[in-house]
Structures are given as C-alpha cells and as structure tokens.
C-alpha cells in the first residue's frame, strides 16, 4: 500500500486489542453480536482513491460498532466517509461529522456513491452531520446513499448536506427524525426504465424533518419518489426544487401528513417551453399561466396529503396530476394565488393507450384557492371530487388543444358532496353532481349534465356591481336542488338558468331581495327550459314570495318552459255579510243618451292590492303622522294623568313625576296592521299664582318615551322620543278648569326586518314634532262627595318628514303630516275624606275621540302611500287620586280604547306630586 495514502489518525490511538479481534472473529462464526468501540473520539482524515474513513466489509463479521464524537474527512476519488457492506453489522454514529469532497459518481456503470453509503447493514446516526462538499455535479454530491434490500438507515437530530442530497433505492429502508436535509433534497428510487421490475420497494419515513433543494443543486424536486417505492412524511417542511416540491412517478406511494411544501425565495427554473399554454381562457377573461414549479407533481402514482400545506408562488400550480394520478387531500390547504391549484395532464411522460383514470379528491375540510381551481392541459378523463366540507376557490378550465395521438380522451367530471363548497366558474365541465354541497358560480358558466340532490345548491354569486348578472347554461338538469339567484330590478335584468336539452326534477329558486323597483314586470325571467320539460320550480323564499323594491313577487310559469317573477296580490280583507234590501220594481225605459266626450286618461297610479315588501311595509308604518301622533298623545293625554287632582290639595306649586305604559294596535290603511308598546316618563314643576276666583299653575316639563313596534312575521322597530314643554292650568273655585300645553319632540325612528330571503334590512332617520292641547271642564259636586265632570279637549300636532335609504337600497321619503284630535268625556267619581286630613277620589270616565286629520304620505322608490288614522274611537277608564297629607299626592289610572284604525287594549298611568 502506498504510504502517502495511508490512514492518518489525529486523535487517541486505536484501541483494537487482541481480545476485540478475537470477539469479532467469534461473531463472524455465529456467536452473539458484540459491541465494538473502534472509532470513538477519533479524527479520521484520508486522501486517496477509494480510501474510506470507516469501511465495514462483509468479512468483518456481525456486530454493533460505535463511533461517538468522531470526525471523518475524505477527499479521494470514490472515497466514502462511511461504507457499510455487511448485512449483519450495525454502525452507531453519534455526535460526530462525516465530510467528503472527492468525485463519487461512476459514469461508466452509472453507480451512485455517497459521503455515507449503506449497501448492506444498518446505520444509526444521532446528532451527526453528513456533508458532501463536492462542487462538480449533483450526482457527486450525495450525502447519504442507501441501496439494497439489506440496507437500513435510522437518522435522528442530524444534518445531511450535499448537492445530491439523500438517495434511497433498491429496496432499502430509511427513517429520518427531527433532522435537516439541505441543498440536494431526498430522492427515492430511479426512473422506471432504470430499475428492475422485480425489485422490492424502498420505504422512507420522515418525521418532523426539513428537506430543502436549492437551485444550485440542479435537483428537479426537493423530494422525488420513482417507481413502486413508498414515502411517509409526518411533520416538517419541504422547500425548493427546480421544478417541484414533491415528485411522485411510475407507481410511487406518498403519504404527506402535517407537511408544509413551498418553493422558497429562489426564482423558478424549468419554465414550460413556449411560455403559457394556449387556449382555455378562464370565464373571467384570463388564461392560466405556468412557471414550471409545482408543489406536488404526480403521475401514475398515489399521493395522500393530510393536514398539509402546499403553496405555489407566482404562476405555478400546487398540484400537477399526470396520467394515472390518484391524489387525496384531507384537511390542510392548497394555495396558488396567481396560478392553478391543480393542473392535470401536463405531467404525463408517455401516452400508452388507454391512459389510466386520473382522480383528485379534496375532503375533511381541505381548502384550495387559486386563480384556477383545476386546469386541464390535455383532454384526458379527470374526476375531481370535493367532499366532507372541503372548499375550493377558482375556475375550472381546459385548453382547446386536440387529443394527442395514442392518448385516450375522456370527460371532465366534478362531484361536490357532504357540505363541500366550490367557488368559481367553468365552461369545461362535462358533468357536475352536487349532493348536499354548494357551487358558488362567479361568472357565466356552461355545464354538460347537472344533477342536484339532498339540498345541493347553485349559488349565483352576488355581484360587486349592479347589472353584472350571470347565466348558467346546462345541457341537462336532473335531481332536486336549490338555485340562489339575483335580480337587478331597476335594470330589468336577472340571473338566469337555461336548460338546452332536457330538464327534470323538482327544484327551488331562492331569490335575493332587492331594494330597487323593477323596470317592467315582464323582464324578470329566471328559468328557461325546453317546452314540455318535466322539471318544476318553486320559490324557496319565505311564504313563496320575493321582496323587490316596494312590493312582493311570486314565481309563475307561462307554459312555454319559462319561469318568471310576477306581482303578488295582498291578502284580501274579510268582506262584510251582505244585508238584505228592498227588491227594485220595474223601471221605465230610459231614453237614448247623446254621445258623451270620453274623459282624459288618468295619471298612472300605484298598482292596487299589491302586497308590500317587508322593508316597504316597515317604512310606511314607521313614517307618516299616525305613528308620531300616537306617541305624542300617549305623552300628553288628560290633565288628571299629568298633575293628578289639583283640587284635593290646593297649593302654591309643586314638583311631579309620572310614568305610563300603553299597548297600541294600528291600521293606517297603507301598511299591514301592527302592534306597538309605548312606555315613558315625564317630570315637571310649576308655580301657583292666586287670582280672583281661583289660581293658575304655570310650569315646565320634560320626558322620554319609547315605542317598540312589532311587524308580524317580519321584525320590528323603535322610536325614541325626547320632549320638552310648558303648561298653564287654571283651577277655578267654581269647579271650572282650563289646561293648556305646548310641547316639542325629537323622534329617532328605526326598523329592522327580515326580508323574504332571510337577510335583515335596516333603516333609520330622525324627525321633529310640535303640538299643543287645550282641555276644559267643570265639576258639579254633590254634598255627599259625589261629582260629575264633563270634559272637552282639542289637540293639534304636526310632525316633520325625513329621507333616507334602507340597507337594501330602498329609497324612503316621509313627508310628515298633521293631526287634529278632539275629545268629549264625562267623569263620575266620589271624594272620600279620611282621618288626618287625607282624601281619596276614585272615578270612572267615558270619552269619545275623533281624529279629524291624521293623514300623511310616505314614498318608497317614489311610490306614494297615503297613511291616515282619521276616525272615531271610544275610551273607558277608571282611576284614583289621593292626597296623603303634608303635600304628598298619588294618582293612578287604567284605560281601554277601541276604534277601527287605532285600538289601545290597555293604558296605565301612575304619578306622584309633591306640593310646597
């Protein structure tokens, strides 16, 4: 042996004793494996062809060898830092490093070698560094090469570095845990033509390991699996690769769990020749572009991704699936913001007829988002399935390239199931099935066969711009499902479903409400089917009606396969029973009349009997003078409810407070009947001024009132009223009284209702009102305490208007109005004297009230609605006033009122006055 190439040891001397040699010999003869410590804490440096740092040959015998704290450096041609060729040997390498820098690849026989090579036996490396620093070519830069059925490697908490990365083939088994593979990536197997068909599969397991392939390494993929070999990844990151993050070809099986696959910051290499693939423009107006990098590249192989993340930057694809690819994505996410989430057909290397079926499944909540969800490069049969709550975003498109000779062509089928959701458009899908899932259609689309089941739905996406309606054209429609659609009433446009050949099944249409008014009732066509089709359509909106602008609409068929929205009639009011009358007697013949001039045609009026939409009904019932006046009168009412009985305790003035609650039932003849509950309080103080024959009480007041409305089946609203005012009350010694008030109010009105599509519509505005009242009466008292008191009252109220736009776009203008209310009443009661100067005065009262005006106008989208509460109602009440002595007074009352337009089933008042 040439001494210049002899081994140089720069550490403790070798401890190979005679006993150790004897034990090794016994092991070779079949004795129990012995542990060797031949290379612990050594520095091994070799320079020379095939001068290996540690070489365990088959002739060395079985056993476990250890190399702890050892450093190995080799630099000769085909010199390997560690070479294992003994199937019965195991090398445990811990807390050390192995480095090689010589040429390792043997081009003559295409043989791979690595810094560490395991051809037979087992390598256990822990906290180690295996580095190939060769800079000649990637095949020379293999850090770890494990090949052969009897070869095994178990790596933990280590770093493996080299332009050729880690290579495993020919039935070897490798496990890598919590480690880092840098520069050249991981490569399992070889291309199918280069490996024998009867070779057993290699198996590699990565756990929480990072794999990186930098552009300088030339590695086409950070991780590649060729042939019938298997890779399992549980946690970790895969980064880089000239063309792909993970490549699986020719029968490979790859399981990726909790893995993250990214290209990293390196620029893309390996761009597709010729640039963008022609044809197949996305419906939105763009064509998919490629930059040649794929997160996962699959052909004739099976890849399962579970809770993993795949990101393709620039214009790449998260997954490229060639012929025979079977890809399942469970949870996790696929992202290609500027490119394709999935590209099919482009990864095929050969086209043997027929091509194997290609399937991609997203399930278990997987998320996929890109410019295109699926881009079919070649017309191969493709089946895309989204299930189990998976969500895909992006169009489904295909090139218009003709089939390649020798390649099979087939349909592009898409299945959505189990609460999956796809958001995008397509003109490329041959068949689409939606079973308990949703397709959100973002643009005009064409589908061959569409079948829906189990509440499957097609959602015509609500456009960002009004008027950008969408059309879905299908050859055939079957099953039973839901279509969510939009209308643009003011433009006379709507989304449309067009069936070209055959339509069957029972389907529902859910139409989003619109606040705009339709240009014409004849333009809201939603569905067109061939004449005589068996398909039926019904509205899924509440009560089978759609709120559009001011009115509600229903769905009707014209018998020619067209289904359109037409105006819905308001429910008819009950008709009174006819009364018998006298029978007319014979009438003399009438002389002929001269021709009369025909009157001019009246101006167009709002359609009669139409049912208001929820928003329009709420706006009409919130506006006008009727609602505001009922609040104002609840705050005002009679003197006795405000001040109590001033006659019980003549004073020089006082302070008082009262609370009240009332239920109102209103029918203003424009909106639907509704209920309102009113509650509030009022505080005031006055000063008494004695005059001849009586006294005046001059004072001021302020209060707050809240009205809570309920619109049956729709929602409700509120009014918050704050008011201030003054009053002057004259109490005469003769029993006559006069009470005058003046009050100003600020009213904050709002409503929130649910439209027929289930979405909330809100509206609010502010208005102001002012009113005055004058009440007079006289008490006729009897000696035993009984009294009779006729009363008369006149109140005038004026409320301003306001303009606003509801949340759904409905334009509302409240023009305000006036109310003039008169009341005639009679009160009967008894004054009862109690001990200590206290008094109580129970009473009953009956009144008749007449509203002389009470009319106002509310406009919705320019359509006028006349509201009015004019009419008569009766009122009954009872109450009690009590003087408790020392200036304290209490009073309370209950009332019931009934009229054709306004009823108050109950009204309660309670108050307290302190006199000084």
Swiss-Prot record:
Supply the name of the protein. Pertactin autotransporter
The record's keywords, sorted A to Z, are: Cell adhesion, Cell outer membrane, Membrane, Periplasm, Repeat, Secreted, Signal, Transmembrane, Transmembrane beta strand, Virulence
Pfam entry (one): Autotransporter
Q: What else is known?
A: Synthesized only in the presence of low Mg(2+) concentrations.
Its GO biological process annotations read: cell adhesion
What species does this protein belong to? Bordetella bronchiseptica (strain ATCC BAA-588 / NCTC 13252 / RB50)
**Which ranges does the UniProt record give for the sequence repeats?**
269-273, 274-278, 279-283, 284-288
Query: What cellular component GO annotations does this protein have?
Result: cell outer membrane; cell surface; extracellular region; periplasmic space
Fill in the domain comment. Answer: The signal peptide, cleaved at the inner membrane, guides the autotransporter protein to the periplasmic space. Then, insertion of the C-terminal translocator domain in the outer membrane forms a hydrophilic pore for the translocation of the passenger domain to the bacterial cell surface, with subsequent cleavage.
Q: What residues does the record give for site: Cleavage?
A: 637-638
Q: Where is the stretch described as 6 X 3 AA repeats of P-Q-P?
A: 578-606
Keyword Transmembrane: yes or no? Answer: yes
Q: Which SMART domains match?
A: Autotransporter
Q: Pro residues bias located where?
A: 571-607
Indicate which residues form the motif Cell attachment site: 263-265, 706-708
- The segment annotated Disordered runs over 564-613
Q: State how it assembles.
A: Monomer.
- Domain Autotransporter stretches: 648-916
Q: Which residues form the signal peptide?
A: 1-37
Question: What residue spans carry the region label 4 X 5 AA tandem repeats of G-G-A-V-P?
Answer: 269-288
Question: What is its biological role?
Answer: Agglutinogen that binds to eukaryotic cells; a process mediated by the R-G-D sequence. Pertactin may have a role in bacterial adhesion, and thus play a role in virulence. May contribute to the disease state of whooping cough.
Q: Does the keyword Nucleus apply?
A: no
